């Protein structure tokens, strides 16, 4: 909660040593002026990042090299990165290389309202995910990026059964992406999106 509600704060923090910090939950929630690069932060010991940039409407700082592999959630197990970028409406960094821990069970509202976000997350580890409900609510990924997500997630190890996934207004292409989506649905996934392009 360190900068939660600090609506005028926008100072550089990239030199901070956060290597022993374990909880960054809602750290910049509603810090609506904050937009600094944090790429040098060592967040490898952080277990909770839920809501970290929730409502940080100007934030588009570089965090592409973060190691989020331990962000699995302690207070709410499995929810370590849920709501992380909710309503962070400027954020659009390439975080496709993040290592997602297989103990993460939820992408709940992770990018809900992050209306600028448009990256390919098809390479993310979704092994443990049992809900991605409202993950991209209000968001439109490009057809290429959304198609790559569907193809990558279907090809990787994933839960079957009633996994809820909201792709926002994103549309998928015919062919491999449509087939991947149909396969996930046949396995029990409940997918909401903008349909085939």
Task: Set out the residue ranges of the language-model regions.
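Negatively charged
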Residues: 1-197
């Amino acid at each position: 909660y360190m900068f939660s509600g600090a609506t005028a704060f926008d100072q550089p923090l990239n030199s901070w040593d956060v290597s022993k910090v374990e909880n960054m939950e809602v750290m910049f929630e509603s810090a609506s002026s904050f937009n600094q690069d944090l790429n040098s932060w060592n967040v490898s010991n952080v277990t909770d990042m839920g809501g970290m940039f929730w409502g940080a409407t100007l934030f588009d700082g570089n965090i592409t090299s973060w190691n989020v592999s331990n962000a699995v959630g302690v207070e709410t197990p499995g929810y370590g990165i849920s709501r992380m970028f909710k309503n962070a409406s400027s954020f659009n960094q390439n975080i496709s290389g993040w290592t997602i821990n297989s103990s993460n069970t939820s992408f709940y509202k992770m990018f809900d309202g992050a209306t600028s976000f448009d990256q390919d997350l098809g390479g993310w580890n979704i092994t443990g995910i049992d809900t991605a409900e409202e993950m991209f609510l209000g968001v439109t990924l490009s057809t290429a990026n959304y198609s790559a997500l569907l193809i990558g997630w279907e090809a990787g190890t994933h839960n079957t059964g009633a996994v809820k996934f909201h792709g926002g207004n994103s549309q998928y292409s015919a062919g491999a992406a449509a087939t991947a989506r149909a396969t996930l649905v046949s396995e029990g996934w409940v997918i909401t999106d903008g349909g085939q392009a």
